[in-house]
Amino acid sequence: MSTSQPPRSVKFSDDERGGWSSDRPRRDGAAQRPADVSTRCRTLTPSDRLRYSPGSLLLIASPSAAERDRFAARVLEDRNAYLSLDKVRALLKGRVPDEQVEERALELLGTAVGRRVESGESVVLGLDGLGADERERWVRMAHAVRRPRHIILLEAGRDAADEDARTALDELRRALVAGELGNEGIQTALRLSGGTVAEVKRIVFRPPPRDE
């Protein structure tokens, strides 16, 4: 004749309790989980004038750095808002040893972007790559001080890009079209290709006009 066994108790460690990551206290010395930056991403349509809120971070992603820079120079009302790793590399060339240029350029660009977003200045950043890891650092920097985050995908120069860049471009386009960039903390996304690139005449950072 079998006898019933008492129910077994299961113990959870402090790090396993709670259904949400924010509910789970960290063990002493355990690394904190990155902040959740996810949001709703709205897909914009091309227009001759694009207006973003002052203090925004606008990322420009393109397989061609030259096309990216030409676009920024043509459409930005405030060209001083534009930063890129290429510009910093050029400033450092000949001033620091060649083997230190990349590290110093990343450091200086991070300092410049961080200072501007913290002070509420608008920042337009020409991305050096098309992968999500390239965007994450800057988006988190802006999210930490509650600045709006936007991206423009400029597909000009795709034919001249190498295979890796085209693959990364295809993945970014897919995520944009699917509305998945909100998972990265990006709030609006605009895709420009072919004739739509020329449709954009000006990008400004101004508050919305008051209703009369």
Where are these regions (language model features)?
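Charged, amphipathic alpha-helical linker segments immediately N-terminal to NTP-binding catalytic cores
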Residues: M1-A35
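Conserved substrate/cofactor phosphate-moiety recognition/catalytic segment
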Residues: P54, A66-E121
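Acidic, metal-coordinating catalytic cores used for nucleic-acid/nucleotide bond scission
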Residues: G126-R135
